[in-house]
């Protein structure tokens, strides 16, 4: 949102997509004095960050669909992350967002806004300050599992998930 000058024009169209059943995932944005409207509901991005790559990540909403499918997310999924956990976490948000994960550097206060999810119309909007741009290229398995859940939210589980039952053609 802070890299495109026309986000004020694009954002309403993006929210219509979400409202109609789409999923939008916004990855971290720098904190700016005049923040554009990012999501369907108010949120304020801070300069909060978690730089210790081994910092504990706590699951705040263990029953949320984002944590339970298609992959069951556990503490194991946060092992092996590289460089940092994340940055530019929101520090204020509308009650219609659900905070999913929390983390903090040693001696710091919890940063509960690292992954926020809101239902909007028929779809889902997510804001994440976690460093997917580092974890996915590094091949961190847990990052792939979590991001898969993010892009799958609201989708029906496939009827046949056993890939071994698919016949191979010669």
Region spans (language model):
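Active-site Gly/Thr loop motif
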Residues: 84-94
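Intrinsically disordered, low-complexity segments enriched in polar/charged residues with Gly/Pro
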Residues: 2-3, 74-76, 87, 100-106
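A glycine-rich, often tryptophan-bearing local segment used as a flexible ligand/cofactor-contacting loop or short
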Residues: 2-80, 128, 142, 146-148, ...
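Generic detector of bulky aromatic hydrophobic side chains
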Residues: 28, 87-88, 132-133
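A generic local structural motif
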Residues: 11-12, 85-86, 112-113
């Amino acid at each position: 949102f802070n890299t495109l000058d026309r986000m004020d024009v694009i954002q309403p169209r993006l929210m219509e997509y979400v409202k109609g059943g789409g999923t939008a995932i916004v990855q971290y944005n720098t904190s700016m004095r005049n923040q554009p409207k990012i999501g369907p509901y108010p949120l304020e991005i801070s300069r909060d960050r978690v730089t210790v790559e081994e910092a504990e990540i706590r699951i705040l909403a263990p029953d949320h669909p984002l944590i339970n499918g298609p992959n069951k997310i556990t503490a194991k999924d946060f092992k092996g992350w590289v460089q940092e956990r994340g940055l530019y976490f929101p520090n204020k948000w509308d009650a219609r967002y659900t905070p999913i994960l929390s983390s903090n550097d040693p001696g710091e206060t919890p940063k509960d806004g690292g992954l926020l999810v809101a239902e909007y119309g028929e779809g889902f909007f997510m804001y994440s300050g976690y460093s997917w741009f580092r974890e996915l290229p590094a091949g961190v398995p847990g990052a792939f599992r979590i991001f898969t859940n993010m892009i799958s939210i609201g989708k029906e589980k496939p009827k046949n998930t056993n890939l071994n039952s698919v016949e191979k053609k010669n």
